[in-house]
Amino acid sequence: MGIRFLKAFTPGTRNRSVSDFSEITTTKREKSLSKMNHRSKGRNNRGVITCRHKGGGHKRLYREIDFRRDKIGIPGKVMTIEYDPNRNARIALVMYEDGEKRYILQPNGLRVGDSIISDLQAPILVGNALPLRNIPLGAQVHNVEFQPGSGGQLARSAGALLDILAKEGNFVTVRLPSKEIRLISKNSWATIGQVGNLEAYSIRIGKAGRNRWLGKRPTVRGSVMNPNDHPHGGGEGRAPIGRCRPVTPWGRPALGQFTRQPKKYSSKFILRKRK
């Protein structure tokens, strides 16, 4: 992937960059793996906003991604590398020898024509999936399961990877992208390699309208609201918030407050907290 910088023909193109999509091999999606996806846009069943700053955006068709990689022992061939509007990573269309087609996340370095396989003793090659217990120390993996059989949930974003640090007993020690070090079952499956599209986070949005295309609504500061709308609101001109610490619109502590439950069952698997 490369990044293309636009010339400042208008204020909206000044300091704006886009992907050059050089890795994309086709613009036609696989219709059998696409479906309508009704997005909630931050509202519940009554239409009440439950998550602010969401709404609008371009319509999208959801691509069904194979996060489980459960085609055990059946080789597949990469047919295309495609753009997915629902994520910042690219997806690869794989044709298996039994005729089935599936989408997977495209690891960095996977090209059209490459062969991949999911097996207990699969070779340590980019795109292959196998249990963590059979992956050597120091390997980089993505699309890792929290629980065996749950499907990949960790390291699915563009450029994400997990480092395998140690193996002991029934667990494997891994380092997450957040620098958190935790234990995961050795029977959980993972895919070899790093998720592609490494430069996705280097793109400059350039203008507010581009975020609206993505379904992101404006974020208004509490200090410019009225006092009946936010605890930070009110006052004459640019007034301080009048509290010892920032709070949310509902009065809960914000900006630095830990949100993880202190007695959560999975805390025993975390060896070092994220930074």
UniProtKB/Swiss-Prot annotation:
InterPro entries: NA-bd_OB-fold, Rib_uL2_dom2, Ribosomal_uL2, Ribosomal_uL2_bac/org-type, Ribosomal_uL2_C, Ribosomal_uL2_CS, Ribosomal_uL2_dom3, Ribosomal_uL2_RNA-bd_dom
One GO cellular component, as annotated: chloroplast
SUPFAM superfamilies linked to this entry: Nucleic acid-binding proteins (SSF50249), Translation proteins SH3-like domain (SSF50104)
Main location: plastid
Location(s), subcellular: Plastid, Chloroplast
Pfam families given in the database record: Ribosomal_L2, Ribosomal_L2_C
Keyword Transmembrane helix: no
Signal peptide: none
Biological-process GO terms, alphabetical: mitochondrial translation
GO molecular function, a single term: transferase activity
UniProt keyword list: Chloroplast, Plastid, Ribonucleoprotein, Ribosomal protein
Domain of life: Eukaryota
UniProt region (Disordered), positions on chain: 32-53, 218-242
Family (UniProt): Belongs to the universal ribosomal protein uL2 family.
Complexes and interactors: Part of the 50S ribosomal subunit.
Listed name of the protein: Large ribosomal subunit protein uL2c
